[in-house]
Amino acid sequence: GQLDLAKKHMEMGISLLEQYQLLYTNDSIPQINNYAVLLTEMQEPALALSSLQKLAQIIKEYNSNHCLDYAQVQESLGSICLITANISQAKTHFKKALKIYEDIWADEPELIEEKYKKIQELYPQAGIALAKSILPTKH
């Protein structure tokens, strides 16, 4: 009922963004991210991943693959891969996102640390050892 209606409206919104060539704009990114979350909740993770991969490609094309928007999409891709138990792919996406965060926020270590913690908290189902394996060791 409600989820199907939400999906329909989100698809209409994304279709309009596509029609007017606005998918690359910063405002479309949260919409497509939310759409991917909804699809995952509706047991359609493959469609969610496809939408996010398309968005990542658009961001890369119109901006770069080394900006915060791209990192955010990589983080979302990682989360969905983790939910679907595709651990190695999740790890790849999280590493890409974290590398971008580290470079962009080089002078703001507290933001980087916050991201590491947020991503690490996604891992309890997959095991804490796995989370530690993607995070750099602190000296």
Per-region residue spans from a language model:
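Long, ordered, amphipathic alpha-helical scaffolds
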Residues: S79, F94-K95, K99, D107
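Amphipathic alpha-helical segments of tetratricopeptide repeats
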Residues: I14-Q19, Q53-E61, L98-E102
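Tandem repeat protein-protein interaction scaffolds
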Residues: G1, S15-L16, L23, P30, ...
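Conserved alpha-helical positions within TPR/SEL1-like repeat arrays
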Residues: N26-E41, L68-S79, E113-P124
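Terminal, low-structured helical/coil segments at or just beyond the last alpha-helical repeat
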Residues: A106-H139
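Short coil/turn linkers that connect adjacent helices within long alpha-helical scaffolds
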Residues: Q19-Y24, E61-H66, D103-E110
